[in-house]
Swiss-Prot record:
Its EC number is 2.1.3.-. One of its GO terms (biological process) is cellular response to iron ion. Keywords: S-adenosyl-L-methionine, Transferase. One of its GO terms (molecular function) is S-adenosyl-L-methionine binding. Gene3D superfamilies: Vaccinia Virus protein VP39. It catalyses: prephenate + S-adenosyl-L-methionine = carboxy-S-adenosyl-L-methionine + 3-phenylpyruvate + H2O. Disulfide bonds: none annotated. Signal peptide: none annotated. It comes from Helicobacter pylori (strain ATCC 700392 / 26695). This is Carboxy-S-adenosyl-L-methionine synthase.
Length: 243
């Protein structure tokens, strides 16, 4: 279904309700440059890690968490890349999103979804975690707490994927990057009003960090190896490995 949510001002803060869930896949594809390429790239690196048998030997099969899994797109990408048996756990606090995810993955028997606040979840030891365009919605004071929980729950040599919208620390460059991004959205069919109304709804809801700040945050919780797998202007995909 086409995203027309912001044809007029919502007069409220952005939230992941039923209206958003109905158009979310279209919103992602038209709002995040190279969205599917980043999903496939992230899935590839997790698959390569699993080929090296990097997962807890106490588990019968690798466990992968997707936090803020929304409509389950990353699990579809993972199932295309990974041939061995895996257990996928998607956690999101939006039931409308999870209903979409369950519908899309009904033919897969390796995925389950939980409607919870992932900040309150006690994770099992896992082979991989993903936070794809999610950390930017977590309150800044809680980001380090969440990442530390993830780090502590990762198996040795496990990986964390972090996809984020980012900002530049240089005011002029940041303005130019935002302008180019808005031009991208116009080319995807969004009007000036739709872009403005969505920006208004996301104010103080989506809080981006710079690339340097995101890397520093990951390093502060224990990750010694953090790499940018992909970057387009103000979007990036990072991989962090626990060693």
């Amino acid at each position: 279904m086409k995203d027309t949510l912001f044809n007029e001002s919502l007069n409220k803060r952005f939230c992941f309700d039923e209206k958003v869930a109905h158009v979310f896949d279209d919103m992602l594809e038209r709002s995040i440059p190279y969205y599917h390429e980043m999903l496939n790239l992230g899935a590839y690196f997790i698959a390569q890690n699993l080929k090296e048998n990097i997962y807890p030997k106490s588990l019968p099969k690798p466990l992968i968490y997707d936090l803020g899994c929304s409509t389950g797109n990353f699990f579809i990408a993972l199932n295309r890349q990974i041939q061995q048996e895996i257990e996928l756990v998607g956690i999101d606090n939006s039931m409308p999103m999870l209903k979409k995810a369950q519908e899309k993955l009904k033919d897969f028997n390796n995925a389950r979804f939980e409607c919870m606040d992932f900040l309150e979840v006690e994770f099992k030891e896992a082979s991989a975690f993903s936070l794809l365009f999610v950390l930017q919605f977590v309150r800044p004071m809680q980001r380090e707490v969440l990442l530390k929980k993830i780090y502590n729950s990762l198996a040795l040599n496990g990986v964390l994927l972090v996809g984020e919208k980012i900002m530049s620390e240089d005011r002029i460059l940041d303005k130019q990057m935002i302008e180019l991004y808005y031009l991208y959205k116009q080319n995807q069919g969004y009007s000036h009003n739709e872009i403005a109304f969505k920006r208004e709804a996301l104010e103080n809801v989506l809080v981006p960090y710079s690339l340097k700040e995101n890397v520093a945050l990951l390093e502060s919780v224990g990750f010694k190896h953090v790499e940018a797998l992909f970057k387009w202007v103000n979007f990036t995909l990072l991989v962090a490995r626990k060693t």
